[in-house]
């Protein structure tokens, strides 16, 4: 009877370890998926920055140039935030408990989702500005 109970406990422990590793891997994959979506938009950041720079060179309107500079700074800020996140992100999580890993990855997912939102907002705003002022 004791052997059966011991075997059940060992089986349960092994299954729960596999389940924890799967949870960690699934959450990591979610973080990476959002990261990849943001990286796809990085080229739009650079394109919009170049278009804003061109607008500033072609126009002498100080109000338009000030707005273009502000939007360019927002694009730089979004890009810098992404770079900073990538440099600090640790996908390995060695020596941490399951709960610590899940907490870390959850926080990282929230951060990268906020960066994605910032990318979307700055790209949309700067694209609309460029489109509106291209012919001026």
Predicted regions and their residues:
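Long, amphipathic, charge-rich alpha-helical segments that form helical bundles/coiled-coils
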Residues: 68-112
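Heptad-repeat coiled-coil alpha-helices
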Residues: 47, 51-54, 58-61, 84, ...
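Positively charged n-region of N-terminal signal peptides that target proteins for export
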Residues: 1-4
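Post-signal-peptide N-terminal segment of Sec-exported extracytoplasmic proteins
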Residues: 34-76, 80, 125
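C-terminal amphipathic alpha-helix
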Residues: 34, 38-39, 97, 101-136
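C-terminal motif of bacterial Sec signal peptides marking the signal peptidase cleavage site
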Residues: 13-16
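Short, low-complexity, disordered segments immediately C-terminal to signal peptides
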Residues: 18-34
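Short, charged/polar, low-complexity loop and linker segments
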Residues: 21-24, 54-64, 95-103
